[in-house]
């Protein structure tokens, strides 16, 4: 991984250590030590200054062996090697350090009992290796793994590490993102190999790996496991999806994710899906309970662009192939001002449209520009906007439009094809109302990776969405919102030491209506209520609901149950309105992104937030 890649970077210092005797010889001469030796072959590091200190130094000119004992410290640039004993055999071009071996570069530190290095072959090994790596100091952004820790320090242990100029291999390796002992979380593997890639990143392969939680719970990891700065899907996704307008309900979904291709610029993930509730009793047979998903991404760094392809087949029933397939291809370009241009084609895209429920957009072809968040001077106001043009094929009402959601659902059976121009903007500002004073006695995090930021904030905003359709219809919505967000408690005590409350009210002016169902606005005035509360230890429960104040109906709701620790957590959430849910494993800093495999649809009743 990127942090451990420092090992051979630091150990490479010893590859330059052949100049050590020359530097030490000067000190030895002052003490009446060995006579000057031939240093013709030692000029490779003439431009580098190597300093060596120890309690005792000797040089055997006949055997060409230099030895230092007692509090040995060798410095080369920013690198420091410490040991009880150091022996450099110039004839064999080999260095051996023994006893409390320590290699340090800035905040990176690696220790062991014995280090052996062959200058000629540029190979070596370190026994009983352990240490910590400050991954915040490493610059190879594509290297594995970033992130096992928000503290930016990764600790590791290995029985032995073999290394050369481009690879290292560890035996019985344990990695942890926990600064305390015993660690809450460890990644264990009997064999870990890291290989330097052409782009400067490292490929980490862990064989027969495990995640160990609190030394009592063990979860297997894939044989081939890679960590880097790129988001990727977790090894296994578990979620629930039992709501679909066309009755293709899948229920519980078990989805292993296999990375068939992955480098910093290209990735291909193939994800078989198993629907246990459809395996028995389905009229379509056993294959109706099996699905398949594929995700492909291609980054073009020189063009600041990324192309992605998603496809999902919900049941291997070829007679209904067109109905069961969902797909999307998208090309995104980051502009010089920090905005983003996107070109998209989507087939059978799912949208959640509030009181209109799930809607299927059969075909959508379009382009959009999303601005970065712009701070307006010293006002504290944040502005963002979005412009989009699409050609859409979806269920709709081209002529007379039913503004009542129930009538619209009952009377809309035909697909229509129209072009749409959509403009949207948001203007927000947050006001801190209260925060507790900071003290030196504030306890360190216990159930969270980082200290909890406590306080009460007032949030205000104005948003506008304008949509124009090629049949002459238009939909306009401009609204204001105000809300309170409160976080009380540091989440370190055993009970009721964390409470998060959120209340947001919004109201606006609605004119016209979309001819489509998927983007029709049906909720003009709404209230959002949410809370997250610690019960005992790492256990928290929460809920969030959105209520249409004009009809009194519950538009959306989600319930959460979480088990959170410093370095990992489990989360179970369920939405009875959408009839969907998910079980997620969070490993702090580990770059698994459950959202990449989630079935959650886009919200269609507003313009997508910039």
Language-model features: where?
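Short, tandemly repeated low-complexity microdomains enriched for cysteine and small residues
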Residues: 98-99, 126-130
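A low-complexity, Ser/Thr/Gly/Pro-enriched, surface-exposed linker/loop concept
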Residues: 87-88
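Long, low-hydrophobicity, solvent-exposed regions enriched in small/turn-prone and acidic residues
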Residues: 2-69, 73-80, 92-94, 104-106, ...
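Hydrophobic or amphipathic alpha-helical targeting/insertion segments
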Residues: 109-127
